[in-house]
Amino acid sequence: MTDNPRLPIFEQWAGRYDRSVQTDTGIFASYDEILAEVVRAAGVKAGMRVLELGVGTGNLAQRFVALGCEVWGVDFSPAMLAIAREKAPEARLASMDLTGEWSPILDQHFDRIVANFVLHEFDLPTKVAMLERLVRQHLLTDGLIVVGDIAFPTAQARGNSGAESWDEDESYWAADETMAACTGTGLEAIFKPVSWCTGVFVVKPSSIISSGSP
């Protein structure tokens, strides 16, 4: 069991998570659109191996299962995982805190690694370090990482939105900052806005991105 101080928030939220994202008129107003865009950008084919970080209640995982993918998923919340197992019983799910020791379930390579409304829990240097680790250790050569999240085109847009006062424990993406941070790491990120405060990143080694991406 993780000792992450954020865990109680998600344990308490699990039972009402799906209802809350469907009725929200703010950040999660584009929730279904984000899910659809992550799936579209991933461009999967049946039989592909997909890893989801922060699987939550399984809303994204079940979409990849329905497309014939082999799905693995991790989350630090037992309550969230219990719901995800009901929705996507075919998926291989494990308890794991991204800030702690990574599960042996990740000791393999995947065609796609995806995350949705998860990585804003980490500051930008941690995000980029995590992306580098995933590419180096867990992504197949021609694979992609696709991330849907609270995100803005620029740091200025994020500042103008007032997002920096929403939650002091969260760190929201700005595409310009992210692309600059990836410079020199061998990664390149492409960003597609979905709403005024959400969007999807496709991340891959620069040589692969430049030769064509979803």
Each PLM stretch: what is its role?
Residues 146-198:
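C-terminal alpha-helical "lid/dimerization" subdomain adjacent to the S-adenosyl-L-methionine
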Residues 138-145:
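Short glycine-dipeptide loop
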Residues 122-134:
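A short, conserved alpha-helix within the catalytic core of class I
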Residues 117-121:
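Short catalytic micro-motifs in class I SAM-dependent methyltransferases
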Residues 51, 57-101:
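Class I SAM-dependent methyltransferase SAM/SAH-binding core
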Residues 190-214:
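Core SAM-dependent methyltransferase catalytic element
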Residues 114:
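A conserved beta-strand element that flanks and buttresses the S-adenosyl-L-methionine
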